[in-house]
Every structure is written in C-alpha cells, then in structure tokens.
Amino acid sequence: MLLCILLFAISGCKTYDYDYYGTISGTVLDYTDNSPIENATILMMPGSQTVQSGPDGNFIYDGLEEGQYTLSVQRSGYQSERKTVEVISGETVTTSIYLKQIPE
C-alpha cells in the first residue's frame, strides 16, 4: 500500500529537462592588468537579475532560456561596460568583461 502511494506521488512530480536551459559563466577583469575585480555588480537584461563578482572576479547565471542577454557591469572607480551574449540550450557561455579604471 505504501509503495502504491509513493508511486502515485512521484508520478505527479514535474521533471525538468535541464538541457533546455543555458548558463552564462563570466569573469570581470581590470582592463590594464587583467586582475580580477571583486564586488562588481552584473545586471542581466532582459529581466533584472543582479549578481556580484566574487574574489576571483567570477560570476554565474544559470537556468536561462535560449536567447540574447545583455550584461551591464558596474564597479566603483571603473567605467561601466555592457556585453551581449547568446545563450544556447544545454550549453555554458563563458565570457570575460574588462573594466577600465576612471582616472583620478
């Protein structure tokens, strides 16, 4: 009886085809010396999801539908930068975004 209940419950669960979604994996770097930039804010459009770059400059967006996305990157002391990437289902797009320091 318990087995029947479990099978019934499992059959009603949705499954997701993870190959349907793509990922953007990127690194924010200093234009001059290629050093990683920590705590840069990356805004993804369309949508309004933001993430912060880690100590190694890395960031990731996953579970994205196929299509074009524009990344707008900002960090205090640097000029903002935008980059458009194409997400393909089941794949990871790897990108680097270079920020130029604002002269003092």
Give short role names for the model-derived ranges.
Residues 11-23, 96-98, 103:
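Beta-strand-rich domain onsets/edges
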Residues 22-25, 31-46:
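Short, ordered, surface-exposed loop/turn motifs in non-cytosolic proteins
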Residues 47-58:
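Short, acidic Ser/Thr/Gly-rich low-complexity loop/linker segments typical of extracellular
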